[in-house]
Amino acid sequence: MSESTGVSTIVVGVDGSESSILALRWAGALAPLFQASIRAVTCWQFQIAVGTFTPVLWNPDEEARKICAEALSQAFGDSTPVDVQMVISQGPPAKVLIEESRRARLVVVGSRGHGGFEGLLLGAVGAAVAEHAKCPVLIAHGSDLPPAFPEVAAGPSTIGSNQAGSAHAGS
């Protein structure tokens, strides 16, 4: 998607964590309101450590694609919104999401991802994206959506259905 298309896009950082699944649900709830497509972005990068090697058979793109697909399945079940694009990108997640924000209406990230410290309210990626993004950022925190989105909070069975979209249109 380019900046000149005029299509509204919600970018979501996806790492497979519960927090990123909640971020996907937020994007699913907001997409009809913004008439937006969703870009589910999963990043990978080589971890450099002294005395180790990268397995030759490791396919990071495929692993990231599986993580993203599983997160979409957990977030939406069989009701994945029609206009969802999986984006697999090599690089630091914060840098990739900030770059994605240049062409987005909104970026949604979870409050904590994998590898974070348990007591933190906001992870390093979320903090960096919130500070440097070129569009508004929503940081999904907790475990539920607000009551304004009951069909989404109810779980995967009704997310993205035509009834869910029409319920939002009247409010």
Spell out what each predicted region is:
Residues 2-54, 146, 156, 161-171:
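Small/aliphatic-rich secondary-structure junction motif
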Residues 88-95:
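Charged docking surfaces used in two-component/phosphorelay signaling
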Residues 68-76:
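A conserved short alpha-helical segment within the catalytic HATPase_c
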Residues 23, 50-53, 96-99, 120, ...:
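Short, well-ordered secondary-structure micro-motifs
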Residues 56-67:
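A short acidic, glycine-rich active-site loop
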Residues 103-149, 157:
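Gly/Ser-rich helix-loop-strand patches that form or flank binding pockets
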Residues 77-85:
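A short helix-to-beta-strand connector/capping loop
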